Structure formats: structure tokens, C-alpha cells
Amino acid sequence: PNPPYNDFLRGNGYNVENPWNDHANSGLSDDGERLSGWLLKNSDLPADIEEELSETPYMTQRAIDFMKEAGDQPWLCHLSYIKPHWPYIVPAPYHNMYTKDHIIPPVRSEEEKQTNHPVYGAYLKSRICQTFARDDVRERVIPAYMGLIKQIDDQLGILFNWMKQANLFDNTMIVFTSDHGDYLGDHWMGEKDLFHDQSVKVPLIIYDPRKEAKVSEGRESNQLVECIDLAPTFLDFFNIKDKPHILEGRGLKEILHSNEDPKDWRKYAISEYDYSTRQARHIIGNEPDKAQLFMIRDSRWKYIFAEGFRPMLFDLEVDPKELHDLGESQKKIHLNAKKRLYDALFEWARKHHSRTTVTNEEIEKRTGKEPP
């Protein structure tokens, strides 16, 4: 593939076949040897690229270009910064802004390391988790990861200042979020594949310029919100009627335009993951079509369903760091929580998720009538 970013870099003097790989995501040794950022041992090197030409500033400028081209017409811009992400390497001056002294201790326990849960245990045996469980790897990678985050912070400042100068800031909703988190050694894990909060509890910061949102300015809500809630939120912002037969989410205006959380908000949040391509599936010898994981949580409990294996359960009130798996507990309170959450997950799974062409109103009109 030849993405536009490679053309951009070649146009700025990086005349190699793949400057994204060889410059934006590689460093140099003291003797000039090119060292790949895909290798974690090179994460402390500065990427061999001018900072203003690296990926994150490039994406900021593309967003600005998009807004300029849109002019006065309504628009929606999905500015998807790829970083922080593999390869974990960042250009100067961000590569050495942070050191191992800035790293907080990992959230993990010996009890977790000795887990008898087949899927979790298989992950802990996988190469990526074995790697990120090492302190020397964390001490090399996390400072670069923090540098990548700091670069995004700075670029958002540049973007917002431009929007203010262009008179866009006061009529544009801004949502800052992510698709997932990263374990970085917490729970002896790497990457994103299970359902601890390090992976699934992502930031969600919303700036709503409408006067009705002033009442919630600076407020933090503890309601269970899912990424699928964003699409109906955007439709509402543009005064477009929601299509609940297509979109499963619930718009967030009730939260944004009130100083109190709604009383009838959802009771559960759900996440799902297919680990069929991950090394863990091979370790436990599972079939691809059985490699499904589901998570359902409420305000206190988190329940993880692994097809073919026992569940996991965490009491977030007593154990907010999720260090003690209660999936095998026979205590009544735990049995009740497991049954209730399993039943709620099964109810969700039985819902009709595929009828996306006809509204409920149209269904009512057609009910009991012979087809034409």
C-alpha cells in the first residue's frame, strides 16, 4: 500500500520506498544504523523524522484542511490519531520528556499470575503478555507511550486554537475518546484483549457548545456509557431524528444538558471480543468459532463470559483494581450476581439486532395486513 502520508513524506525529502516505516517509525543507532520502532528495545530512541512532519501533526493538519474545505456547510470530522500505538516510538523532543521515574507501579497480583482460568491463563503465557510483564520492557516503552500522549495534547491545543481563530469553536461539539486502552503490564497483560478497566474504560470527554449544556460544564458522570451512544448523540446535535431500529446506542443529551444523571439510564454496559486470531486460542486448543468473550457490568459487578469455560466475576466495590476473580465462588452474593448478569447478557443476545431497514412504526402499520 502507498498511503497519502508516504507521499507527503517523500514530498518533504524522505525519499525512500516506505518513509512511514523507515523514518516516522524508526530510530538511528549512534553509528547511523536504522533501528525499527516495532522492536520494543528501540522505544527510547527518537524517531528519525522532524516532529512537525510526524504522524500526529500530520493528522492535525489534515483535520484543519478538512474544516477549511467544508466551509459553512455542516460537517462531522473523525480525527483518528493512530498514536499512542505500535510502533512505540516518538520523535524528539517527546522521546525523553519522561523517564522510568514517571511510571506508576503496575496493577497486578500474584493471585492473578496463578489463575486457573483457561483463557486468562493462556493470555499470560502468550508472547506479548510475557513481554509486557517484564519491568525492563515497561521502563523502556511507557516513557515513549507518555511522550506520544503528550504530543497529542500539544496537537489538540494547536487544533483548538485554530478553531477559535476560525470562529468554529463555539458551534462545534468536540468528543475525545478512544477505541480501547492498553494494559502495558497491568494484570500481567499487554495490548488490549481482555476486559479489565485498563482496556475497556476509555476516556470520554465531551465539549457541547449549546447553551443548554452549560449546566453540566465540568461535571463528571458515572453513568454506564458505550461507544455506540455517540452516533445518536451526533444526530441529535444536527437535529436529525434518531433511527433506533438501526442504531442501538442512546444519545447523551440527557446527561449533557442536566446537572443530574437521568434516573432511567441503562443498567448494564456490554463489550465483546473475538480472540480467534490471538496466540491464546492456540495455547488452549480452542476452535476459531468458539473463541468469543463477552463482558457485562453494572454499577458494582463485572461478569466475563468465555464460551466453553467458566465465567470470571469481579466486585468493583470491594476490589476496584480487579485483582480477585470470584468466578468460582459459591457464596450466595456471588452466585446471585453471576446468575443475574448472565441472564442480562442472554437477554441482550436475544434482541433483534439485524432488522435495520424498517422502523417499529412501519412494522405497526403493516401488522395484520396481507402483503400487497
How would you label these PLM feature ranges?
Residues 62, 201, 226-237, 251, ...:
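Generic recognition of well-ordered alpha-helical segments
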Residues 1:
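His/Cys-centered metal/cofactor-coordination and adjacent catalytic loops
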Residues 106-107, 215-219, 243-246, 265-268, ...:
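Short, hydrophobic secondary-structure boundary micro-motifs
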Residues 76-79, 98, 204-205, 234, ...:
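A short aromatic-rich beta-strand->coil structural motif
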Residues 126-140, 148, 307, 326-372:
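Long, internal low-complexity/basic segments
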Residues 180-186, 212, 228-231, 236-312, ...:
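C-terminal cap/loop subdomain of S1 sulfatases and analogous C-terminal strand-loop tails that border
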Residues 8, 12-224, 237-246, 333-336, ...:
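Active-site-proximal cap/lid insertion segments
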